[in-house]
Amino acid sequence: MKKYLKIIATVSAVLAGIVAIAFVLSNLKPVDLQDRAAQLAAYCAAHGYNTDSGILVDYGRFSLQRRLFVYDFNQDKIVLKSLSGHGKGGDSTILTADFSNEHGSYCSSIGHYRVGRHRNMYNRPFVPAIEVNGLDKTNSNAMKRGILIHPGVGPLSLGCVTLPVFRYMQVSELLESLPHNVIMWIYE
């Protein structure tokens, strides 16, 4: 019995260490975030979209790290950051994402999205969601696939961008306060 308790204590200590490391890594800003924000701001200006704020989703980061950033281009700073789930399809794991634009793949798609209207989910009419429209070849089927931004539990989805409930509510309120045509850029 003592042997098993010792093993359980060791495993618990290792898991606590992993969680602590993930928390520290989660709070570190990606080194290229300002460059990516500048690229997104230039994209928005060139295509006539909102040049005040944008959303960057860095799926190159592990799902235990904050990887969704609402960025204020005028102040050149992050105004909100969050954990974000990705699609469970393909070779995706709970830590890393695989990408596809194919219907039924259950993968996330990289590229630029125009953030649309607030609505409820297709398969859960009581759950709020935000529509997104893919603007690139890599995500052109987003509307047909039913890809949304919505609250979710855990790091995996059917291809949607999922956020913890409290962060989803903050992002939703923030988006409603901004002019239309906000762009979200998912990259790895």
Features from the language model and the residues they span:
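Cell wall/extracellular polymer interaction/catalysis modules
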Residues: 21-158, 165-188
